[in-house]
Amino acid sequence: IHYVEGYSLNLFTSAQVMLKPVRQQKVGLLIDAGLEPDLKKRHLQVADGCNASLGLDIGPCITTERALQINLNRGLTGSSWGNIEEPDILLRSAEKLKQSGATAIAVITRFPDDGESLETQLYRQGKGVDAIAGAEAVISHFLVKNLLIPCAHAPALSALPLNFDLDPRTSGEEIGYTFLQSVLVGLSRAPDLVRKVNLDLKDNSFTQRANLLSIDDVGAAVVPQGALGGESVLSCIERDIPLVIVNNPGILNVTSKKMRLDERTSEKGLKVLYAKNYLEASGLVMALREGISIKSLRRPINSVSELN
């Protein structure tokens, strides 16, 4: 399993970068000056705890010159979005971390508290949109685009009041002041991003690429029905990589029907498989990997037919 940020995934699926697995990354901490002193200390304690208990290589650490000021918005589709008031300050701090030896960066920014909003309440019950996810994506995409090293974001928020009606999928976000620990664990083993244009063409290509993963190594893409318009999915379709489409409806509505994937299946040979849930999807992926005919797994099984 490789921890790959969304923009990095876009670069990977479009064949612009390859992934180089590593044993350990040196994770720099980038802290928004907008954090209150107590909240900042909580996050530093999390970093110390991950260092002591998990053996992660964390540091150096830098605090931005002034607050980054994150704004949360909603897009026309209803999905969450956001923007950074001080992107230049964010980038300067990240560049200092990279120059100081960090090979991956965990960003901690102060997000607006909206624990009482209807959107947040619905999300906690497993029925709504994650109001902060879009802004988080903007931050990590921005840094990866400029630095080309693994980056991920952990929002800093005030602790939410106890809720007895939580959806299990959100429970992990309720146990403390921070999401940082999961980010640090993921980044600690995140693969390096290697641009194809930087590979030495004069060198033996097999030697260079023996430990690199490319889009050519991908055997299938598992995607929720309705979320087929993303850049990575489109890149997979362009390369005729088999799609396993899972019935997991959300707010987006870019479906296989709207994408006319069934037409492409008959015309171009793209393999599109449908699954009712992720358990079924995992079985389809296993069958593809082992070269098992999907038809042999469905009932009834048709008899072999002779050509006229």
Protein language model features and the residues they cover:
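Metallocofactor- and cofactor-centric catalytic cores in central/energy metabolism, strongly enriched
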Residues: 1-122, 128-133, 294
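Fold-independent oxyanion-binding glycine-rich loops
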Residues: 30-34, 62-64, 108-111, 146-147, ...
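Short, aromatic/basic amphipathic alpha-helical patches
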Residues: 42-50, 143, 235-236, 256-258
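Short, charged N-terminal beta->alpha structural module
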Residues: 42-54, 67-72, 173-193, 197
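Structural alpha-beta junctions
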Residues: 48-62, 100, 141-152, 238-245
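Short connector loops at secondary-structure junctions
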Residues: 59-76, 154-166, 253-255, 260
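Generic multipass alpha-helical transmembrane bundles of integral membrane proteins
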Residues: 76-84, 93-94, 98-101, 105-108, ...
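C-terminal functional extensions of proteins
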Residues: 159-162, 182-220, 224-308
